[in-house]
A protein has these predicted regions:
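Beta-strand-rich domains and repeat architectures in extracellular enzymes and scaffolds
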Residues: 30-66
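Cap/lid segment of the alpha/beta-hydrolase catalytic domain
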Residues: 234, 400-536, 543, 576-578
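Short, solvent-exposed loop/turn segments at conserved positions within beta-propeller repeat blades
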Residues: 60-65, 108-114, 184-190, 236-242, ...
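Predominantly five- to eight-bladed beta-propeller fold
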Residues: 15-20, 65-66, 154-196, 241-242, ...
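Multi-bladed beta-propeller domains
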Residues: 13-37, 70-88, 110, 118-136, ...
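Asp-box/WD-like beta-propeller blade repeats and closely related beta-sheet repeat scaffolds
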Residues: 109-192
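Active-site-proximal cap/loop segments of hydrolase catalytic domains
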Residues: 482-685
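Conserved beta-propeller blade repeats
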Residues: 35-50, 86-104, 126, 132-149, ...
Length: 685
């Protein structure tokens, strides 16, 4: 379907501002069905080639498919797929001589079973299968001597692998963090580090048996072992502390740090004397801007080398271990006010970081080898593509988004800043905000407005392709988004501005105070700046913390809105702490737990204001959500129903907290249709 055809689907006629239900369905199917993105770039050791992963939606089959692609780094030849893309292929990793590429595949019909393969590149040979693991394979790395391939995989307790739960043993629970959203129970299937001979002559060997989870394994330069991150201390479930560990191929695991902070994403130096990593020193305060550190193995001491840039090096897209490009230089990426850039850092911290990429876009992952920087980057009107940067010059290698652009004609943002809604002294007192004009925009008309609030709250909106905004704008809505206090991408004080009022280190306003003021300030500014935004037809929506904000605004400022959609929300802070898969970290964010300060948790809870809700509400929640459990939605729905409020509740079976991002394609399209129908009905002229 071409862009002109999509405009017809959007139905932006002379008298209509939003589309009809049948058009909503087709619009949702068109945009969801064309979703595609590149990721996980891997540069060959000599810098000549780049491998990456392309993931696309197959709407007809209601699934996702991914395949590994390969291109010359100089763009001299068109990229080509290395795998068929009929399954979920990923995690490419080069052999040290660049002649083999390891990758994973979900080709098995058994749920969770994943295979690890190596494929010859530029030479004769056949695909070789190294391992078949029952519970996933990730973080694939080739040892520097070429003899081993390492990976992570969950080790299952046989007591809980039976076909029928009636035969399973009862689970003995003694710690928090027993379950994880999207994974289910994890304490009885911890993630371990495995190695397998690269020639396939032996079975994989588990290097980290036991109850502790190990992540981010990276090889020492002499191939004698790996460095990982794990929480193995007493009371590990009561704080955010994680230590770096040395995991030898033979011998005992040894901690390299001593529970003084949260340290992860290790990267040993080329000479083996240091380990770069991402983290921070205080495991009892969150959020903090994650920094790049360098640990001296001889002394056990570390220094922070990114302090010249007060931004987080653990981005909304995730964190990636710093890459050494020499004995004294590192490359890492960090967020910056709605963008994410790659930076070069002095490994001593003597000079400030220098940006290697720029522009109004978000880099989502990167790799460096052989003098070539490869990035996976997205901008608002184009999905994530692969580019190389050599000598400051960029070259785009992939073009997988061409069909999406042709079929859906993505729209662009207008960025603007707004003064904070209440006093702020930690940095520039301004909020980054964006507005997207409706498709077929006519300045003489007035359009309904949808105010979006992101989750987290310690994440950011920004300069990247976002299907939510594209769908809403294509349906005829003006789309407003912002990064209020509490968001990431700014100085640490910005993120910590809404820490709990009694937090022992960095007390803030708590949730539901400065953040609310900022969101409303952005809405006021957008309406004042743009006469084509109709202030009498404003809707609001958000998910997770954004759902929290939606319910809070419904109770405190419902008169500002015609309708509000609250998705996967936190509605009751007290019950959220005792039921969420990560609820026990609330105290590092808010200070006391709910047992020590129930009054403050009640003050921050949107459910407290349910009697004051007068605006129609749509509640959307996933039945397998462990981050914000279904009970959060049920509490709000039951309360509103008992009070005779206007409320509609949709439950998505089999989905988790990630419904809007990686839920089944059919459910993602149905969700869009439900949201568009709701706001078209309530925001009609």
């Amino acid at each position: 379907r071409g862009a002109a055809s999509l405009a017809a689907v959007a139905g932006a006629g002379a008298r209509e501002t939003t589309t009809t239900p049948s058009a909503h369905r087709e619009l949702a199917d068109t945009i969801v069905g064309h979703q595609i993105a590149c990721g996980t770039p891997r540069v060959s050791p000599d810098g000549r080639h780049v491998a990456w992963v392309v993931t696309r939606v197959d709407l007809k089959a209601n699934t996702y498919r991914s395949q590994v692609w390969l291109a010359h780094a100089d763009g001299s030849r068109p990229p080509r797929p290395l795998t068929a893309g009929e399954h979920r292929d990923g995690n490419p990793s080069w052999s040290p001589d660049g002649t083999w590429l390891a990758f994973t595949s979900g080709r098995s019909e058994k749920k969770g079973e994943t295979t690890l393969h190596v494929l010859p590149i530029g030479s004769s040979g056949e695909l070789r299968t190294l391992a078949t693991m029952p519970d996933g394979v990730g973080h694939v790395r080739w040892s520097p001597d070429g003899r081993w391939v390492s990976f992570t995989s969950r080790t299952q307790d046989e007591r809980y692998t039976k076909d029928s739960e009636a035969w399973m043993a009862p689970r003995k629970i003694e710690t928090f963090f027993t379950r994880l959203n999207g994974e289910g129970f994890v304490f009885d299937r911890p993630q371990h580090v495995h190695v397998v001979p690269a020639d396939g002559t032996a079975a994989p060997r588990n290097l980290t048996p036991g109850t502790a989870e190990h992540g981010g394994p990276e090889w020492l330069p002499d191939s004698s072992g790996l460095v990982t991150s794990a929480a193995t201390h007493e009371g590990w479930d009561l704080d955010l502390a994680t230590d770096l560990h040395l995991v030898p191929l033979h011998g005992e695991i040894r901690a390299l740090t001593a529970r003084t902070g949260s340290y992860g994403d290790p990267s040993p130096s080329p000479d083996g004397t240091r380990v770069a990593f991402i983290g921070y020193d205080d495991p009892l305060t969150y959020p903090q801007n994650a920094r790049v550190g360098v640990l001296e193995l001889a002394t056990g001491r570390h220094r922070w080398v990114s302090d010249g840039l007060d931004r987080t090096f653990s981005t909304t897209s995730g964190s990636i271990a710093p890459v050494w490009t020499g004995a004294g230089e590192l490359v890492a990426f960090a967020e910056d006010r709605g963008t994410a850039r790659v930076w070069r850092l002095d490994a001593t911290g003597a000079t400030p970081p220098v940006a290697l990429t720029g522009g109004r876009r978000i880099v989502k992952s990167f790799d460096v080898a052989g003098g070539v920087l490869a990035i996976a980057a997205s901008q608002v009107d184009r999905p994530t593509e692969i580019l190389t940067v050599v000598g400051g010059e960029e070259r785009r290698l992939s073009a997988v988004g061409d069909e999406l652009v042709r079929a859906t004609a993505p729209l662009a943002w207008e960025h603007f800043t707004v003064p904070c809604g209440s006093p702020y002294a930690g940095g520039p007192a301004e909020i980054d905000a964006w507005i997207m004009r409706p498709r077929d925009f006519d300045p003489a008309r007035r359009y309904p407005v949808l105010l979006n609030v992101h989750g987290g709250p310690h994440t950011q909106y920004g300069e990247t392709y976002f299907d939510e905004a594209q769908v809403q704008a294509a349906a005829g809505f003006a789309v407003v988004m912002c990064n209020p206090r509490g968001s990431s991408g700014r100085e640490q004080a910005w993120g910590q501005a809404i820490l709990g009022r009694k937090h022992p280190v960095a007390p803030g306003t708590g949730w539901g105070d400065a953040d609310v003021a900022d969101v409303l300030a952005v809405l006021d500014a957008a309406l004042a700046r743009h006469a084509w935004c109709d202030p009498s037809r404003v809707g609001m929506l958000g998910g997770s913390y954004g759902g929290y904000m939606a319910t809070m605004l419904a109770g405190l400022h419902g008169e500002r809105f015609r309708a509000i959609c609250s998705e996967r929300a936190v509605n009751n802070m007290i019950s959220e702490e005792w039921s969420s898969d990560i609820g026990t970290v609330f105290r590092v964010e808010h200070g006391p737990n709910h047992l020590d300060d129930a009054e403050e948790y009640a003050r921050m809870s949107p459910i407290r204001h349910v009697r004051d809700i007068s605006v129609p509400m749509l509640i959307i929640h996933s039945e397998e959500d462990l981050r914000c459990p279904m009970s959060q939605a049920e509490e709000l729905f039951v309360a509103m129903r008992l009070l005779g409020k206007d409320v509609t509740f949709y439950r998505f079976p089999g989905e988790t907290h990630e419904l809007s991002r990686s839920g089944s394609p059919i459910h993602r399209a149905q969700r869009f249709e439900i949201i568009l129908d709701f706001f078209a009905r309530h925001l009609a002229a």
